[in-house]
Amino acid sequence: MLTFIKTEFLKLKHSKIFLLTVLGALSIPSLLYIGLLTGEHATFQGILDYCATYACSLFYIIIFTIIIAYLFGREYTEHTLKTILTTPLSKTKLLIGKYLMFFIWAFIITTITFTGTVIAAYLGGISDITLSVGLNSYKEMLISEILLCLSFSPFVVLSLVMPNMVFSMVAGAIFSIINLFVYTSKYAPYIPWCSQYLISSNEIANYSCNTATSLAILLVTFAIGLTISYIYFTKKDVCL
């Protein structure tokens, strides 16, 4: 499995997708830095909260759909899946490896976003920067990122059924817009792509829904998406 992950990273050297996702991750710190330059007053905790909110409820929806479309649809669009399966690698291991690669890639994107935000805060003149606040916010972002990755298993199904980058980007944009409208409503804890940040930041305490219910919905979403993607991927015939 480690060899497979290394191979996936080597493939990224010949693709511009990784650079695109990195630029997407840096767009949030850039916007926050511009806001600081225009005279917007903010604390270190405040700017990290802004970063986590917009990243996990808006930008990551689009970025993660692009990552999934690339990881799970590339072999279909490039017609290389049959060649890969001639190696000692089963469809099950290939699917698990793709999921692991998605989690690792998402972790890298989250770390880049957080690091960029800290740098933006420093360059923007925020004076109350502390290690404890930074580590706590980073922990919340990582928890939110893990939960968001779990909630994205239905997008894996979409990428397997329709391995088209444009379709995935449109789907990501639509879900981002939905998140914007739902995030401030009473239904947010019941939507997996919204509830992940509410759980990690403990903002879910402000809603009538408890953490266990939101987490259960999210895990069920993951289980359903994982099961369907496994069945579809392992049963579908591989075409040249």
Where do the language-model regions lie?
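Transmembrane helix-loop junction
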Residues: 74, 87, 118, 122, ...
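Membrane-helix interface segments
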Residues: 16-18, 90-96, 133, 164-169
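Aromatic- and glycine-rich beta-strand/loop motifs that create alpha-glucan
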Residues: 1-22, 238
